[in-house]
Amino acid sequence: MTVTAQPEFGLHSVDATAPVEEITKVMKHHGGVIVRGLVSEEVLQQVGREIKPFFKRGNHEGPFCERTRTVCSIPRKSRTFVEKIFGNPVYTAVCDELLTAHHEAWVGGQYFKFASPPVYNSSVAFSTLPGNSQQALHRDDMDHHGKRPACDVGQYPIGRDSIVTLFVADSRTTKQNGATRWIPGSHLQHHLGKPDLSKEVHIELERGDAFIMLASCYHAASENLSDTDERIVYSAFTINSTYRQSENVFLSLPLECLREFSPWMQKRLGFSASSPLCGWIDLTDPREVLNLPEPSDLERYH
């Protein structure tokens, strides 16, 4: 496949009241977009009360520097995070447009069309302290073995990406205190295309701002070169429901916690089957087996 020269890529921002179509248009062209003021001060304060005490345990989970503290398995720790950040209506609508799985099939002589909305993939809260080292540039869809040919920006197809990432700033993030480095346009590369360091930009955010990004983009945390700044960012990841979730939420979230959420959120967390019947228990809707309200939204072929 011959790929023509790409137009200029860069970092763009929109207001949280912007139409979803405008947000996804920028994302398909550049790979990501800043959404100013996506999360309110009231929500941030409540999420902080629920999550920040876990930072004090000093956990350094996963492939991060020892000056990075993380909180994982957030659905069982912060209901507000799940409902107001992961479940933010702008982020939800963006994910629905970019990640809903569609399929068509013949069963005998009858033709069917199926659609499965995306679900929760994972979440991590990050606290990066002064002295935090630079993270290597990477793509978030590595876990799912994302393979893609290069493509022209005008030809970006829905379904090319398996995950949409959300970063929400709890504190002001700057180049000095470790703001995320990102390479705009890298979502259009071949999956084995190397990151071009000359094109990286820093995602500088004010408290309550968010960055929504396609998981095929190269990005990484930067060094925290400040003397005193703690950079706190909340991240949420939503995935095409035909893929395996990175976080095993079925083991990390107790059923008694799950029941506190609305039926819609339970399904969004992955506690449902997808059309026509993927994720069953004994060939039965798992919500029926778990005695959860409202059945899965299935388009059955039998």
Curated annotation (Swiss-Prot):
The protein's UniProt keywords, in alphabetical order, are:
Dioxygenase, Iron, Metal-binding, Oxidoreductase
Annotated Fe cation binding lies at: H138, H219
Provide the E.C. number(s) assigned to this enzyme.
Answer: 1.14.11.-
Concerning InterPro entries, the annotation shows:
Phytyl_CoA_dOase-like (IPR008775)
Give the Gene3D superfamilies listed for this entry: q2cbj1_9rhob like domain (2.60.120.620)
Q: What class of enzyme is it?
A: oxidoreductase
Q: List the disulfide bonds.
A: none
Task: Output the GO biological process annotations, alphabetical, semicolon-separated.
Answer: biosynthetic process
Q: Name one Pfam family in it.
A: PhyH
One GO molecular function term?
metal ion binding
Per the record, what phenotype accompanies loss of this gene's function? Does not affect the biosynthesis of penifulvin A.
The protein's required cofactors: Fe cation
Family in the record? Belongs to the PhyH family.
Assembly:
Homodimer.
Purpose of the protein: Dioxygenase; part of the gene cluster that mediates the biosynthesis of penifulvin A, a potent insecticidal sesquiterpene that features a [5.5.5.6]dioxafenestrane ring. The first step of the pathway is performed by the sesquiterpene cyclase peniA that generates the angular triquinane scaffold silphinene via cyclization of the linear farnesyl pyrophosphate (FPP). The cytochrome P450 monooxygenase peniB and the flavin-dependent monooxygenase peniC then catalyze a series of oxidation reactions to transform silphinene into penifulvin A.
Name of the protein described by the UniProt record: Dioxygenase peniD
